[in-house]
Regions:
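Glycine-rich, proline-tolerant flexible connector loops at the mouths of alpha/beta enzymes
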Residues: 37-60, 116-122, 127, 162, ...
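Glycine-rich, aromatic-flanked loop segments that form ligand/cofactor-binding clefts
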Residues: 59-71, 103
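Active-site-proximal loop/turn and secondary-structure-junction residues that shape catalytic pockets
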Residues: 14-16, 40-42, 72-75, 116-120, ...
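Conserved beta-strand positions in the central sheet of alpha/beta enzyme cores
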Residues: 37, 68-70, 113, 154, ...
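Active-site acidic/histidine proton-transfer and metal-coordination neighborhood
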Residues: 61, 81-193
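N-terminal small/glycine-rich loop or linker at the start of catalytic domains
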Residues: 1-12, 70-83, 116-123, 158
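N-terminal substrate-binding region of glycoside hydrolase catalytic domains
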Residues: 25-49, 70, 74
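Histidine-acidic metal/acid-base catalytic patches
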Residues: 1-32, 99-102, 108-110, 148, ...
Length: 274
């Protein structure tokens, strides 16, 4: 499925939620898509062998690519947005890194998203510094593990309007983090920007300028309209010119559909904009 030469994949953690998780890749294929992506689909940092096998088999049997997989994100319903920088979750994240890399290797996934995590106490400067130091240590571990399976690690700015305690809320902050980690290990070339157009637009960033400025550092793109995080065409974001710009810049990756469908009981209705 292509528009302006772009390939679209379905985030099956937010779309097709009317179906059991393992049925979603096949539903995406039936809707005409060749790729899927997921947030970390288990509560535990290391899934059991049967769970991992079933997940990988569902994707393979559907005949779709696993485009992107998140490292463990924590309890999203409770407001968590990643464990990368969370001191109490240090052991959980580090247990998750090899597990995530192994699934990526088995499924042929080449993009692993590492959500930064919320500030534990934004008013505590010492704790904030501790979190940032931990994030760099964990990103070094994650990037090295990903490199071993020929995958990139994605850094995603998440808007601080919806998630006020999330510190990496702009493209500039994400790139600064990438550069900091690269300075620690100059051999690491697999840290990339995840350009989520919804989050960037919610932060009032100039999307065309961001796509141009960081063209060679974008590892993945995601899309939802603004406001509301619905399907393209439900808000005010001029998305088609951005797609044309990405194609003109030579972007060869996937663009993930990561929006909330108007009818959660029938995701396929949300694809009429394509």
């Amino acid at each position: 499925m292509r528009t302006h030469g772009l390939r679209f994949d379905v985030n099956c953690s937010i779309l097709f939620t009317e179906l059991p998780l393992l049925e979603r890749p096949a539903a995406a294929k039936a809707a005409g898509f060749g790729g899927v992506e997921f947030w970390w689909p288990w509560d535990d940092p290391v899934p059991g062998d049967r769970a991992a096998d079933a997940f990988i088999t569902a994707i393979a049997d559907a005949g779709v690519d696993l485009v992107s997989l998140n490292f463990i994100t924590g309890d999203i319903a409770a407001g968590e947005r990643g464990l990368l920088s969370v001191p109490k979750a240090k052991d959980a994240f580090r247990a998750n890194v090899p597990a995530c890399a192994e699934i990526a290797a088995r499924a042929g996934c080449t993009r692993l998203n590492a959500p930064y995590g919320n500030r534990v106490d934004p008013a505590d400067a010492r704790l904030t510094a501790e979190q940032d130091e931990l994030a760099i240590e964990n990103l070094l571990l994650a990037a090295r593990a990903a490199a071993a399976v020929e995958a990139d690690v994605l850094i995603e700015p998440i808007n601080s309007v919806d998630v006020p305690s999330y510190p990496i809320d702009t493209s500039a902050k994400a790139i600064a983090l990438i550069n900091t980690v690269r300075a620690e290990d100059t051999a690491l070339g697999n840290l990339k920007l995840l350009a989520d157009l919804y989050h960037l637009a919610t932060m009032s960033e100039d999307l065309s300028a961001v796509l141009a400025r960081y063209a060679d550092q974008i590892g993945h793109v995601q899309v939802a309209d603004v406001p509301g995080r619905g399907a393209p065409g439900t808000g005010t974001l001029a998305i088609e010119p951005l797609f044309r710009q990405l194609a003109a810049q030579g972007y060869a990756g996937w663009t993930g559909l990561e929006y909330v469908p108007a009818d959660p009981a029938d995701t396929t209705k949300s694809f009429t904009w394509l």
